[in-house]
Amino acid sequence: MALVRNNSSNGREPVLSPRSLTSPRGLTSPRPLSVQPTPEPVRPLANFPPSIWADRFISFSLDNSQLEAYANALEEPKEAVKSLITDTTIDANTKLKLIYSVHRLGLSYLYPDEIDAELNKLFEKIDLQYYEQVDLYTIAVQFQVFRHHGYKISSDVFKKFKDSTTGTFTDDVTKDVKGMLSLYESAHLRLHGEDILDEALAFTEAHLKKILTTLEGDLARQVNQVLKRPFHTGMPMVEARLYFITHEEDFSSHESVVKLAKVHFNYLQLQQKEELRLVSQWWKDMQFQQSVPYIRDRVPEIYLWILGLYFEPYYSRARIIATKITLFLVVLDDTYDAYATIDEIRSITDAINRWEISAIDQLPEYIKPFYRILLNEYDDLEKEYSKDGRAFSVHASKQAFQEIARGYLEEAEWLHNGYVATFPEYMKNGLITSAYNVISKSALVGMGAIADEEALAWYETHPKILKASELISRLQDDVMTFQFERKRGQSATGVDAYIKEYNVSEEVAIKELMKMIENAWKDINEGCLKPTEVSVALLTPILNLARMIDVVYKFDDGFTFPGKTLKDYITLLFVSPPPSLEN
């Protein structure tokens, strides 16, 4: 239903009361002034679809005793799996397949030191000669294990599967569906200059699509699932659940792995449903749907997005903080894009830059509650984190929020003036308005000691991996939303700017932007290889933020219209029961 506001833009009808005007000589009073109400400004309403979840997640009630029971139940299988990982009697192939399954099931964070120690030993022993004796599936699995954990295993391990005469992959590869599927997964970990993996990606994708209709059972589901979204570009929690469902034969021989995965899924679902309840209740209490009803009401979707950055139990507080700040961003973005006039946008931007409660007087009435809540939340965070000397992280998040407000204003001025920016101009501002900087900085706030001032200083240098993830955030969004934005008459996206800058067709522009995204993924892959500049714990949210952009925007604007991918993901993680512990 269209969101139509009959009140004036500042929430109050301008009223002028006629005064009794009497002439100084006592003559008859003049006629009362005819007062015309100030017309409601034309607003760029987007009529966003309403939430598909309403208050569903508020009703959840956490059973703390059950959560504690799951925590206790984790200990036995956790120790058993640790013993498997460190078992010196297990051969290299079995050990690497075990680590592969542990990683795919989202359990590797439980054993960072043990896995690293084992991979160090194995990486030193294994060479190209060893791989001459191994099949494609095994090689591809081991390639993924090493690359996912930062080891630069050579892509030359796949050379033996190419025809020396034609230079293409052999027919034998097409007959090995599991091997081909694993090679396809491996190709997404490619670096710049790894032509063999570029070729492998195109080759395996074409052949897997060709044979998909001939496959049955789990193998058909595996191929369909991976063609839709490879593990490397997926949301870790969702990929773990899907792997458990469709790849049980990979790990079913290890009873302790199966048990650990089941208990882990049950524990995480309880914890995460409670977090979702907390942010949903907070959102309702803040009454944003009453004060700013034109915005996208997307609490579960934003929580899912942040969960995609880090799902580990010890980041619970971090997720709640980052979810709230990202919801603030949604309010700001939709206010600038889908409601405020240019004069109101200028006033709001100025107030956010001033960041003081006295600035509220200059704001239109409808946005005042938001501004007050925004300042209060940040003030509470600053007090909370000043106690352990971490207020610097809150300041960084606040500065990023102020920066994005200025970026949104820049876009609004372009639209107001009918200006289509050059592509370099667009990208400079577009990387800011992608919201990447705000989300990534806000994600640091609750991460604890690992996200210290040195880590923040590294962020501020804008390293290549950060730039790459940021670029993906901007361009993947643009490619999927530019038509919707055009229809609404909104500011030009990267697609429009590229068309204008290089005088090319829409098709060519999209193709070139997708190439830029592809190269950015290679930069991310390189940035995750050892030796890394900072802790892997800091790199992982950067990688995962790029993954979540792919999840949300690969096929459509999944955030504005969340009834497809995000609905399925939310259902899987927070509605459907996790694997039963009874069997």
UniProtKB/Swiss-Prot annotation:
Cofactor(s) needed by this chain: Mg(2+)
Pfam family, one: Terpene_synth_C
Biological processes per GO annotation: diterpenoid biosynthetic process; farnesyl diphosphate metabolic process
EC number assigned by the record: 4.2.3.23
Key words of the record: Lyase, Magnesium, Metal-binding
Domain description: The Asp-Asp-Xaa-Xaa-Asp/Glu (DDXXD/E) motif is important for the catalytic activity, presumably through binding to Mg(2+).
Disulfide bond entries: none
Keyword Nucleotide-binding tagged: no
Chain positions recorded as Mg(2+) 1 binding sites: D333, D337
UniProt superkingdom: Eukaryota
Region of interest (Disordered), ranges: 1-41
Tissue expr: Expressed in roots, in head core tissue and leaves, in green and etiolated seedlings, and at a much lower level in green leaves.
Molecular-function annotations in GO: germacrene-A synthase activity; magnesium ion binding
Organism of derivation: Cichorium intybus (Chicory)
Alphabetized InterPro entries for the sequence: Isoprenoid_synthase_dom_sf, Terpene_cyclase-like_1_C, Terpene_cyclase_plant_C1, Terpene_synth_N, Terpene_synth_N_sf, Terpene_synthase-like, Terpene_synthase_metal-bd, Terpenoid_cyclase/PrenylTrfase
Residues annotated as binding Mg(2+) 3: D477, T481, E485
Family, as annotated: Belongs to the terpene synthase family.
Pathway: Secondary metabolite biosynthesis; terpenoid biosynthesis
Residues that hold Mg(2+) 2 according to the record: D333, D337
Function of the protein: Involved in sesquiterpene lactone biosynthesis. Produces exclusively (+)-germacrene A.
Catalytic reaction annotation: (2E,6E)-farnesyl diphosphate = (+)-(R)-germacrene A + diphosphate
Enzyme class: lyase
Motif (DDXXD motif): 333-337
Noted pH dependence of activity: Optimum pH is 6.8.
Record flagged with keyword Lyase: yes
Biased composition (Polar residues): 1-11
Protein name, entry field: Germacrene A synthase long form
